[in-house]
Design a protein with these regions (language model features):
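Short, glycine/acidic-rich beta->alpha junctions
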Residues: 24, 64-66
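Beta-strand-rich recognition domains
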Residues: 1-50, 54, 74-148
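Short beta-strand segments within Ig-like beta-sandwich modules, predominantly Fibronectin type-III
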Residues: 58-64
Length: 148
C-alpha cells in the first residue's frame, strides 16, 4: 500500500486482498523450528493492531506500520509456536470500507544475531491451524506501490 513503509509492503500478510474484514480479529499460529538456542528478536508491524504469543504466552503487540522489537529471551532448540492476531479497524465515517481505502496486515521477522530465521511470508506454507493469514499483501488490488 502506498502509505505503508517497506517492511509492511515486503512482509504483510492478511486473509484477503479484497475484503478488509474491518473490526474482526484474524488469527493464526505457526510452528517455528529453532535450531540454535539463544535470545531472539521479533520485529513486528501491523495495520491496524496485532498481538503475538510465544508458546501460548503473550509477548507483545503492535499498533503501527512502523516496526518495533519484541525480545524473546532464552529460546531453546526445537519447535515453538508463534501466535498472531491482527485486527483491521473500521475506517473513518464517510470513507468507504474497501481494500483500496482500508487495507490490513501484520508483518514480522524473527531473527537471532541479525540472521532471519522466519518471516510472516512463511505463513503461506507453514500454519499450525486452519488459519486464514496465508496471503501476502503484495498481491493486493486497487492500489499502487510507489517508491521514493
Amino acid at each position: 500500500h502506498q502509505l505503508w513503509p517497506a517492511f509492511m509492503n515486503t512482509y504483510a500478510a492478511f486473509p484477503s486482498n479484497t475484503d478488509p474484514t474491518s473490526g474482526s480479529a484474524q488469527t493464526t499460529s505457526i510452528s517455528i523450528n529453532i535450531e540454535t538456542a539463544g535470545n531472539y528478536v521479533l520485529e513486528v508491524a501491523a495495520d491496524n493492531t496485532a498481538s503475538f504469543t510465544w508458546d501460548g504466552a503473550s509477548i507483545g503487540s503492535s499498533s503501527s506500520t512502523t516496526t518495533s522489537s519484541i525480545n524473546i529471551n532464552t529460546v531453546s532448540t526445537g519447535p515453538h509456536t508463534l501466535g498472531i492476531s491482527v485486527t483491521n479497524n473500521t475506517p473513518a465515517s464517510g470513507t468507504a470500507d474497501t481494500w483500496a481505502n482500508n487495507p490490513g496486515g501484520v508483518a514480522y521477522t524473527l531473527s537471532l544475531g541479525g540472521t532471519v530465521v522466519s518471516t510472516s511470508l512463511d505463513l503461506v506454507s507453514n500454519t499450525t491451524t486452519s488459519s486464514n493469514l496465508v496471503w501476502h499483501t503484495r498481491l493486493g488490488t486497487g492500489y499502487a506501490v510507489t517508491t521514493t
